[in-house]
Amino acid sequence: MNLADLRYLQSPQGRALLAELAAEPLTPDTHLGVAARLRQRVEPEQAQAVLEMALLRQRAARKFSRAAEMVFTRDGLEQATAEPVAAHRAARFAAAGVGTVADLGCGIGGDALALAATGRAVLAIDRD
């Protein structure tokens, strides 16, 4: 994903298309048909960005309860800590009385989100 893709996905049109795709399961059997429909409505690059994000969000639903609101890259999702694991870690920080946490190399921020949910002050840093 590049910056232009991200901007498009956050635009009203991109959000609307993502919402449409969220309502239908994307499978290997439907993938090509959905891609063709999207390319009839938007530029090929935009269609690819929407389809890729919809697929990633569908996979991410196994890890994140709010996947439909999040933005993913394939690598980021594969490396992301699932919510239950992140919540367990965050609870341990809270129980230890840790007030501020620096999550260096945070990736998409699964651990940072869980830490923040426990009231920790979080500084999340990643190079990309």
Placement of each model-derived feature along the sequence:
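SAM-dependent transferase fold signal centered on methyltransferase-like domains
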Residues: 1-128
